[in-house]
Amino acid sequence: MNVSAFLVRLTQMLPLFAGLSLLSACGPEDPNAFAPECVPVGILAEAADMSSYAGPSHDLSTLAFQAGIAGINGTCSDAGKGHALHTQASVVISVQRGPAATVRDVTIPYFIALVHGSDIVSKHDLSITAHFPPNVDRLALKSDPLIMDLPISRRMNSDSYRLEVGLQLTPEQLAYNREHMPH
């Protein structure tokens, strides 16, 4: 084959090479080839609120403090060529001092659990402290972000997981919440 015939043949094949190069962009190296969604997040209804009383009576005069999960903020992004989902989650907790409060600092324990199907993959026990200045009885606190990299693939996507958030309650507080939840 002479040089001119080779160049003519090469020119005829250029569209084929161009098409193959476009297809190669759809492989695992293309960040747009696999764009996972963020993990669904939920607040456990039974663990969304916490009341602490000074004494056995559960009336307003003995309320030391009350806390509740007011919201969850977060972001997610592809953390590794479609193999991990980089997730950040922060919790917003509202805290109110009650008439029986004797301290200005209250530590609120909470958790963020990563659930896959019906299994708890990991549970992060965390806490945040409310510092009440004089003449302030209500605060909204935002936690530092919890950072997690979740393994994902085309078969095991972000919908396979969910984050569950709640306040870490004593058995008595949990029973109280269950008893007083709307049905």
Model-derived segments and spans:
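C-terminal motif of bacterial Sec signal peptides marking the signal peptidase cleavage site
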Residues: 21-25
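Helix-rich interaction surfaces within compact, conserved domain-sized segments
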Residues: 35-36, 122-183
